Amino acid sequence: MFLQTLRLTMPRMFLHMKPSPITITRACTVPSLLSVAAPQPALVAANRPLVFNRGFKVRTSVKKFCSDCYLVRRKGRVYIYCKSNKKHKQRQG
């Protein structure tokens, strides 16, 4: 009984309220949480492959760890790169 009364009176409660032009503009321009769908993980993974780039270890003295490591001098700094193990990347700081 209460739910029927509530259901019938709810639309009448809002009849006297008229939306202002600002409210209408906000409703049209500001996306609500309900209208914006969250990206699904399967779609995100399909669009962008996950590529992890290793950063440089910043050290005062750099050294080669294996035979594949090689030294490069750029921008006044010494860099160590490695073809076989990306963990060996270093930058002299």
Swiss-Prot record:
Give a yes or no for keyword Manganese in this entry: no
- What is the documented function of this protein? Component of the mitochondrial ribosome (mitoribosome), a dedicated translation machinery responsible for the synthesis of mitochondrial genome-encoded proteins, including at least some of the essential transmembrane subunits of the mitochondrial respiratory chain. The mitoribosomes are attached to the mitochondrial inner membrane and translation products are cotranslationally integrated into the membrane. bL36m may be involved in a process influencing telomere capping.
For this entry, the transit peptide stretch runs 1-35
What family is this? Belongs to the bacterial ribosomal protein bL36 family.
- Spell out the molecular function terms from Gene Ontology: structural constituent of ribosome; zinc ion binding
Its annotated compartments are: Mitochondrion
- Add the further remark from the entry: Present with 500 molecules/cell in log phase SD medium.
For this chain's UniProt record, which GO biological process terms are given? mitochondrial translation; ribosome biogenesis
Q: Which GO terms describe its cellular component?
A: mitochondrial inner membrane; mitochondrial large ribosomal subunit
List the source organism: Saccharomyces cerevisiae (strain ATCC 204508 / S288c) (Baker's yeast)
Question: Which HAMAP family does this entry report, sorted A to Z?
Answer: Ribosomal_bL36 (MF_00251)
Pfam families cross-referenced by the UniProt entry: Ribosomal_L36
- Subunit composition and interactions: Component of the mitochondrial large ribosomal subunit (mt-LSU). Mature yeast 74S mitochondrial ribosomes consist of a small (37S) and a large (54S) subunit. The 37S small subunit contains a 15S ribosomal RNA (15S mt-rRNA) and 34 different proteins. The 54S large subunit contains a 21S rRNA (21S mt-rRNA) and 46 different proteins. bL36m has a zinc binding site.
**In the UniProt record, what gene is named as encoding this protein?**
RTC6
Q: What is this protein called?
A: Large ribosomal subunit protein bL36m
SUPFAM superfamilies in the cross-refs: Ribosomal protein L36
Keywords, in A-Z order: Mitochondrion, Ribonucleoprotein, Ribosomal protein, Transit peptide
